[in-house]
């Protein structure tokens, strides 16, 4: 690798939405004591350039955190977030709002999409109640119906109220709580865990097991869109189960980047996002090859490495990243070339 690298193309167009630099259009006030914020009233986004400029002189650890949280408008990210926002607009307007299945390997950006939506539509309290437009639950290994219900109720702050309730009564409590909180979408992370490892998994009529059966009935009762996110096996489950893909027909697959045009395009977008004084030529041949050898095209690993690179460079008061910064960051994090790197 060399410090002198070719300049990135200045004609490449890409938008960046910075989730950490958003402000309410009305300063956080709602229109009345009861009215929740609607999807078309999401937090206003500060321009990417202004957000980046705001942290250029920040301490090294703040600049590193900026890199971890920056939103990159890749095709898959835009498709997923726009679909979720469209689903939120359907809540309360139609009886079958639909849903979405987002799949990708670990670190591809599934949870980051959920974090971005949650940041755009945060909880909003009035004098008399609290609104929660986005409800979230994360499934663990072998999740049960109770795990799903209580996870959502706990997120909404209603867990104690329903702790002793069972069956249909608990489901009704959950549906009522979602309505009271003005919830417009339910985000389910690690949803691949609901695939049974054995037994009912062999039943072609019950591919998603007991929780899958319950989720269908719950959706039909609450009329709120559900977005499921999980590993690629979840996509296979939805493809095979007509009950699932007819209720939640949307599909977004998050890529793991291989060396090529899409990888270079991602690096160009990231280069413009980095809080450094000058371009870092991430898409130049030696840097792109090194970054892929360490990350194998995994977005989470890439952001982690670059955040440490920026931190190292900030300590050195450098205006751009050099070969020494890449190597030192890799050494500090023990992120070496992985098997399968090209």
What positions do the PLM features span?
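Pre-Walker A adenine-sensing motif
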Residues: 81-93
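Post-Walker A helix-loop "phosphate-sensing" segment adjacent to the P-loop in P-loop NTPases
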Residues: 119-130, 158
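A short hydrophobic beta-strand->loop->alpha-helix junction that borders the nucleotide-binding pocket
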Residues: 132-143
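The catalytic "switch" region of P-loop NTPases
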Residues: 195, 204, 208-287, 339
